[in-house]
Amino acid sequence: PISFDPLRVGVTPDVELVTHPVLDLLLSPNLEVRVVLARLGALRITGEYGVSLPTFAMRLTQGYLFPTWKTSDNRVGWILVPSSGIAVSYGERTVLTGRLEVAAGIPLGHNDAKPLDSWAPLELLLAPALTGFRSHVMLGVDHPFLPWLRGRASLDFWRIGPSEPTRSPLFFGGSAALDLKTSERTTLTLGAVVYDYDQHRTEVVRGDDGRWQRKRVRNVDVWPMIDFVYRR
């Protein structure tokens, strides 16, 4: 997916505010606070606390992602999504990072929206609101090759809440990217993201007894990653 780096505002050396004002502020108001909890040499521990309100985006996409419900009393309800996480990073030049994050959807009234059964990035984005829960574990590495070139990679694991019809709640992913410094204030990121997940896909295969039968298989999708970062 083409992505846009969030706006980061340093309040103090240990406190940072993060939001996506261009893409999300009007559609899904969001804010994350990152607080450095401890520094021990090259080790840093950071707490991450956020909240978002995805209802505007969900209502805007009625007729595409969700039913319009023009002739019924069904509706996309108000849903608040708080999140909490912790990140542990180590290293000065090559940085290793581990992150654990949990988000939950809190309905503020009646809601009829159901899980989308769609592409993995969209499923994971709205999982707290539509399934009630999303947890995420990430292991990553960031290494500079040249003064103007950095490489980074990650392994990811997600678990979301239950949905109907029943499917596996487990998502696996990985990413690799190169950050190219194009000027003193700009960076271009090029890479790819892969997802392994259950989308109710089936294939007809021949069993050991010679009979043909349908078997559930997981989807594996690869998405390009393009990002442009501007720093003031």
Stretches with model-predicted labels:
Residues 11-13, 37-41, 90-96, 143-149, ...:
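Outer-membrane beta-barrel strand-turn architecture
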Residues 2-3, 82, 135, 172:
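Residues that act as N-cap/strand-start positions at coil-to-secondary-structure junctions
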Residues 3-6, 85-87:
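Short, charged beta->alpha transition segments
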Residues 122-126, 132-145, 154-160, 179:
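Transmembrane beta-strand segments of outer-membrane beta-barrel domains in Gram-negative
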Residues 22-134, 138, 194, 203-230:
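Outer-membrane pore/translocation modules
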Residues 1-3, 10-25, 29-33, 45-53, ...:
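Transmembrane beta-strand segments that form the barrel wall of outer-membrane beta-barrel proteins
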Residues 157-232:
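Predominantly the C-terminal beta-signal and adjacent terminal strand-loop region
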